[in-house]
Structure formats: C-alpha cells, structure tokens
C-alpha cells in the first residue's frame, strides 16, 4: 500500500518544483496585498488566516492547509517565511515584471487559491435612502487592484450580488439597492463616486454570461507571454506537444505610434465634457464618429466611419469618460494554447459579453510604395510563399465625388490597407528563421520583403486595378501591419467563417484616416474556454465594404 510519503514523492517528481513555489509565492504576495489594502474577500481572509495558523510560523516544516475540502501540502522553510518577511513582503519582485503579475495564473497546484470568490451572502435588504460613497464600503482605492481578475467579477469582489433568473439579471448593490439596467448602474456609480473604479463594462445583464465560469486549469508553459508589458498577463499553455511559439518580440502597441506616422495635425477635435462623454450632441469626439459611439463602453457592430476616442488633449476626466476603451489596453484574461491540429490559437479564460473589447492588432507599420511595375525577384533569392501571408485583409476606400469637401464634422473613409499575421511554418523553415536575430534585420530589409509580397496581395482580388488606382491617388502609399516578428497576442487569432470577433477601426493617437488602430470586439457572448476567431469575409461586412482575403 502506498504511503502518504510515497504519494508526495510521486507528486513532486511530476511537477516543476521551482515553478510551483514561484506560483505559491505569488499567491502569498497577492493575499498580503489584498489584506493591506482592505480589498480581500471573505474567502481570502479565511485562506490567509489558515495559512498562517497551519504553518505555525516555521515551528514545523510541512503543514496541511485546508482549502475547500482540498488538502494542499505546503513546505515552509525559514528563509522563505519568517515574521520579517511577512511584515516587509515575501521577496522583491523582478523589475521586468509588472504589478499585474501579482494576480496572474497560479497554475495547477494553487488554482483554487487564485480563483477565490466571496462566499454566497444572504439576500440584501433595501432600506430607502440616498446613495453615497458609504454604499460601497469595500471599493478598492484604484481599478488597478482588480486587474488579473475576471472583469465581470469585479462587482462581486466589491460585495455586489448578481441575481440571474428567468426574468433576467439584476445586480444588488451592497446597500441593497436593485440595479436592473445599465442606466441604473451608471447612475448608482456616479452617485456613490465609484465610477472611477467600477465602470459600466464590469457589469453584464446578459443571461448567457456566467461570471463564475472559467477555463479549466492546465500546466503553464509561461505565466505571462507579454512578460509584464500587458496590464493583464497572457498565459501560454500546451497540452498537445512540447512546442513553443516561434520567437518574437512582444509589442503591446503598434510601432511607430500615430504621432510619428501622421503628417497631418494629430487631432481634428477635442472635448472638455463633464458628463463622462455620453452625449453625442455635446461631445465633439463622439460627434466626430457621426454620433455613433460606445454603448456603456461596449461596441456591438462595426462603424464604417471609424470610431474616435477622446484623446490626451481632451479636457474630460479620464476615469469617468465612457469614450475611452481601446486606449486602456488589454483587460480580459486570455490564454494562448495549442490546438489538436498543432496550431496556436487564443481562448478566453472567462465568459465575455457581446461588444467587449479584446485587444488591438499590434505590429510594425510598414509601407508599400506604389509603382507602375512590381520589383523583379532578385536572383538567388527564394520566392515568397503564399504561406507567409496567412491572412490578409484590405479595405477599399469608399468612392467620393469630386465636389465633396472634407470638414471636421465629416468622417474619414474606413481604411485598413493590409493586416498580415504570421503563418505556421514547417520545422525546417523554423530552424532557418531561428538563425537570424530579430534585432539584426533592418527596416530596409523588411520593406524590401514587403515589396516582394505586394504582387501576391493585390493579385488575389479582381478589383486590383481600380483599388490600386484609388489608393495611389488618395494616399502616397499603402501601409500594412506586420506582426510576423513583432506583435501582441492578436497575432495568434485564427480565421473562421463563423467568427466571434469583429474588427473596428479606432482612432486614439491620431485622427489621420490612414492610421487607425485595428481593434477586436466580440460580436456575441462568448463562453469561457472558447477559441477567439475573426474573419475578413463575414456576411455583414460584405454588404457594406469590399474586401479580399488571401489564405
């Protein structure tokens, strides 16, 4: 009969000891942080108390910590846990890691600690009163304290209740007030001065969304693929084989920024709203989008005019502004994973409501010079394979009459010249590419490669002549985003004929119509663990825009 010691030896022989203890230290650091800032949930209070009580502060080396009927064996040694370390912090964090890592995935052994949730509370009874900041007593000092959690669980962490039944979804505020729609939520957040921390996109009234559902835990190849660049860690898992993605430089944003690309004035309008930029008539930035903007920081369909967010020169209060979404960056929890077909893809770790912003498509902006004839292939150079451009999208500029005059109130044409994402290469190709350093390749070489790819991009569409003519006479050249060597998590998004994401052109760092940000939004509710996909040939956009894809 196998003894407990034998079981323990087998357990530790099958896991990464350093990785497990790194995760455990992050759990302890997170608990310490929430306790010090009075943002801990009831469950976290109990967890922290049991850890300290059961460890007996180094009087025994191995103790059992009870967590929800599960026994977790924790080895506590003197240099790792002492009264001084508990008082001053566990250990200094690596400077290259952001504070968002404190809330990162805690792996297999500590997964039930990372997914802490408040115990179900008794029904809240409402007593008539005028709401104030005292109605949300457990509100953290800053929204950053909620990073790393499921965004839709943020109200629950602040002791709200979400009641879902056949009649719909109702939120119960800590003071007992019922909130049955987004307008009531926004009014309550403004009344209680909590809108700076709990914004409207943290609430969901969709009955298809379960805020407690999350993807099953899996061994992590890397806790944060962005290595601290993203506000929320991007996990990397592979349960199929031992492969890792091709080496690339993670970029949180596109490069160069719009301020370095545009030769025109950066911003055509600015606003100084005091109402959160919710009025399309009074907010100049929302009016620039022809009055169609976010609905409580969500976007459910594509806006052909592009979407103009409030910029750095606007006088509106950023924490209250409802017209700043994309510029906040990644907020949802994503996971890059290996598919059974040995391809890389991305899935959401939590349920997502329709219209949720996911991330932008980051990469390096390159330019295709327009010329009458294509550059010839150099002798001795391999031809560019179609596989090197796995997914390309080009948006045709809407035709305009010669009498049309461009004003500040008019909206620029939607223009996404080319989006290029990396393709899966053969093992031999990967070995060849790994011999070259990313930093050693100059911008001239990249542009040269882009020029060689240009004929293949254009020839896949029958509208090549008219499209090229339009672009040549409207802009100096065609620009495209290259994420083959530098990009973000969006480079792993896959194509689907039935996508759950759509693309929206958003202007944040410039109003130049040539340089929008390419943002991804959910087009319907998405369950936790679902692969995130997008398409350049979906039916709805085909009705309004001419596009072509090359696969």
Curated annotation (Swiss-Prot):
Q: Which GO terms describe its cellular component?
A: chromosome; nucleus
Q: Which UniProt keywords apply?
A: Cell cycle, Cell division, Chromatin regulator, Chromosome, Developmental protein, Metal-binding, Methyltransferase, Mitosis, Nucleus, S-adenosyl-L-methionine, Transferase, Zinc
Q: Where does S-adenosyl-L-methionine bind?
A: 342-344, 491, 494-495
Q: Which GO BP annotation is one of this protein's?
A: convergent extension involved in gastrulation
Provide the reaction this enzyme catalyses.
N(6),N(6)-dimethyl-L-lysyl(9)-[histone H3] + S-adenosyl-L-methionine = N(6),N(6),N(6)-trimethyl-L-lysyl(9)-[histone H3] + S-adenosyl-L-homocysteine + H(+)
Q: What class of enzyme is it?
A: transferase
In the Enzyme Commission scheme, what number(s) does this protein have?
2.1.1.366
Q: Where does the SET domain start and stop, copy by copy?
A: 332-537
Question: Pfam families under this entry?
Answer: MBD, Pre-SET, SET
Residues given in the record as Zn(2+) 3 binding sites: 277, 310, 316, 321
Q: What happens when the gene is disrupted?
A: Randomization of left-right asymmetry, including heart and visceral organs.
User: Any idea which positions bind Zn(2+) 1?
Assistant: 271, 273, 277, 283
Please state every residue range assigned to the domain named MBD: 146-210
A GO molecular-function term, please? histone H3K9 monomethyltransferase activity
Which residues does the annotation say bind Zn(2+) 2?
A: 271, 285, 310, 314
Residue ranges of every copy of the Pre-SET domain listed in the record: 269-329
Q: Which InterPro entries match?
A: DNA-bd_dom_sf (IPR016177), Methyl_CpG_DNA-bd (IPR001739), Pre-SET_dom (IPR007728), SET_dom (IPR001214), SET_dom_sf (IPR046341), SETDB_methyltransferase (IPR051516)
Please list where the region (Disordered) is annotated. 426-447
Q: Which cysteines form disulfides?
A: none
Does the keyword field hold Zinc?
yes
User: Could you tell me where this protein is found in the cell?
Assistant: Nucleus; Chromosome
Q: What is known of its domains?
A: In the pre-SET domain, Cys residues bind 3 zinc ions that are arranged in a triangular cluster; some of these Cys residues contribute to the binding of two zinc ions within the cluster.
Which family does the entry's similarity section mention? Belongs to the class V-like SAM-binding methyltransferase superfamily.
Q: What does this protein do?
A: Histone methyltransferase involved in left-right axis specification in early development and mitosis. Specifically trimethylates 'Lys-9' of histone H3 (H3K9me3). H3K9me3 represents a specific tag for epigenetic transcriptional repression by recruiting HP1 (CBX1, CBX3 and/or CBX5) proteins to methylated histones. Contributes to H3K9me3 in both the interspersed repetitive elements and centromere-associated repeats. Plays a role in chromosome condensation and segregation during mitosis.
Know the name of this protein? Histone-lysine N-methyltransferase SETDB2
Instruction: List the source organism.
Output: Danio rerio (Zebrafish)
């Amino acid at each position: 009969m196998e003894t407990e010691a034998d079981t323990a030896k087998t357990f530790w022989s099958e896991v990464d000891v350093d990785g497990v203890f790194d995760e455990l230290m992050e759990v302890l650091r997170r608990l310490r942080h929430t306790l010090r800032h009075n943002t801990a949930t009831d469950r976290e209070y109990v967890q922290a108390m049991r850890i300290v009580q059961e460890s007996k502060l180094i009087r025994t080396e191995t103790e059992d910590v009870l967590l929800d009927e599960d026994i977790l064996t924790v080895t506590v040694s003197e240099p790792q846990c002492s009264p001084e370390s508990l008082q001053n912090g566990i250990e200094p964090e690596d400077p290259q890691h952001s504070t968002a890592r404190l809330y990162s995935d805690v792996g297999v052994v500590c997964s039930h600690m990372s997914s802490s949730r408040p115990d179900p509370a008794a029904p809240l009874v409402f007593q008539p009163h005028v709401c104030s900041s005292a109605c949300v007593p457990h509100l953290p000092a800053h929204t950053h304290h909620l990073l790393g959690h499921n965004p839709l669980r943020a109200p629950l962490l602040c002791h709200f209740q979400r009641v879902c039944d056949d009649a719909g979804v109702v939120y119960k505020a800590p003071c007992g007030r019922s909130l049955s729609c987004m307008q009531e939520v926004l009014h309550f957040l403004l009344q209680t001065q909590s809108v700076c921390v709990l914004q409207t996109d943290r609430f969901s009234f969709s009955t298809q969304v379960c805020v407690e559902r999350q993807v099953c835990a899996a061994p992590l190849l890397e806790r944060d693929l962005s290595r601290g660049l993203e506000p929320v860690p991007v996990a990397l898992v592979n349960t199929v084989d031992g492969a890792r993605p091709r080496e690339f430089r993670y970029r949180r944003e596109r490069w160069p920024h719009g301020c370095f690309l545009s030769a025109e004035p950066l911003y055509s309008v600015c606003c100084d709203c005091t109402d959160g930029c919710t009025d399309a008539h009074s907010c100049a930035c929302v009016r620039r989008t022809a009055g169609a903007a976010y609905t409580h920081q969500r976007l459910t369909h594509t806006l052909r005019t592009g979407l103009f967010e409030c910029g750095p020169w606007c006088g509106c209060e950023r924490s209250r502004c409802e017209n700043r979404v994309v510029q906040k960056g990644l907020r949802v929890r994503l996971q890059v994973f290996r598919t059974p077909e040995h391809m890389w893809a991305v899935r959401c770790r939590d349920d997502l409501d329709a219209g949720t912003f996911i991330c932008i498509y980051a990469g390096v902006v390159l330019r295709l010079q327009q010329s009458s004839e294509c550059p010839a292939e150099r002798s001795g150079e391999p031809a560019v394979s179609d596989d090197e451009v796995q997914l390309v999208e080009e948006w045709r500029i809407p035709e305009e009459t010669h009498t049309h005059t461009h004003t500040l109130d008019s909206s620029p044409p939607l223009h996404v010249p080319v989006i290029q994402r990396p393709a899966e290469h053969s093992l031999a190709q990967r070995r060849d590419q790994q011999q070259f350093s990313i930093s050693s390749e100059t911008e001239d070489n990249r542009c040269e490669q882009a020029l060689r790819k240009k004929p293949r991009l254009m020839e896949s569409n029958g509208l090549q002549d008219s499209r090229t003519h339009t672009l040549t006479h409207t802009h100096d050249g065609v620009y495209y985003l290259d994420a083959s060597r530098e990009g973000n998590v969006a480079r792993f998004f896959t194509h689907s004929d039935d996508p759950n994401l759509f693309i929206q052109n958003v202007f944040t760092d410039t109003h130049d119509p040539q340089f929008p940000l390419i943002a991804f939004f959910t087009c319907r509710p998405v369950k936790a663990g679902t692969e995130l996909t997008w398409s350049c040939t979906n039916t709805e956009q085909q009705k309004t825009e001419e596009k072509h894809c090359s696969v």
